[in-house]
From Swiss-Prot:
The gene is DD11. Residues 1-22 form the signal peptide. InterPro entries: DD11, Prolamin-like. Disulfide bonds: none annotated. GO terms for cellular component: filiform apparatus. The keyword Transcription does not apply. Keywords: Signal. The keyword Signal applies. Mostly expressed in embryo sac cells. Restricted to synergid cells, especially in the filiform apparatus of mature female gametophyte, via MYB98-mediated transcription regulation. Also detected at low levels in egg and central cells. This is Protein DOWN-REGULATED IN DIF1 11.
Amino acid sequence: MEKAILITFLIATTSMVYQTIGQEEEISPISPESLAYEPAAAYEYDHELLSHMTTRRIKFLQDCSDKMSSKCNVEMTEGLIDDKPVSEDCCVNFLKIGRECHEGLMTFVFATYELKDVASAILPRSKRMWNKCVETTAAKIGAPLAFET
């Protein structure tokens, strides 16, 4: 009995203090326009970036990307972020895709919305990484060209 009185007292007190709780709330329907999906800025930016590329260029970059092993992709990404050298095996894989592929992929990837702000720091690192691989590994596979420094 005491518990029921306490609960009634708490509800009555709360209803007086917070009068909106004690009143019925009018529920209005939500307009479909307010739920319309609007693409994020990143999507729009990257879509615009791709729209300026030819199908041939997109295919070229896709083929370049397919030539890199996933292990070396991870190692190179970590190397670019941490400014560390990559293994000899990944240097070989890296150099075999060719300078044009490397340069094209780096330019494209770091033009995307998420990475465009770090491009000025990362692109020079990618050139240093390429040059270091040329210096240490190129003689074993034929001599790709180094980037100008």
